[in-house]
Amino acid sequence: MSRRLVALSTVATALDAERIATALVERGLAACVNVVPGVVSIYRWKGAVERDLELLLVIKTRADRFEALREALVSLHPYEVPELIALPVEAGHLPYLAWLDEATGEGRG
């Protein structure tokens, strides 16, 4: 069984958030993507400190799907350098974790 991950990304618009989230779930690269509006991002970009209102994508996936997820997200994302980081899931509700595995293709023939 592959390790489970929670991946994070941000986008500027609700349209982009829904488009990317839907594509990742439809392709079996994510079991679920939460879209969290109202995230204030403060970051350095091209020598200047920037501040933007963004939407956070909280993406539940498996480690063996991450590379395909990364390729898809980068191709769908409008940013020049999209944020994508992943954190390991150390524990969770076992029925939910089983569903995550099934929704991302674990055990399918």
Show where each model-derived region lies.
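Positively charged, small/polar-rich N-terminal and surface patches that mediate targeting and assembly
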Residues: 1-109
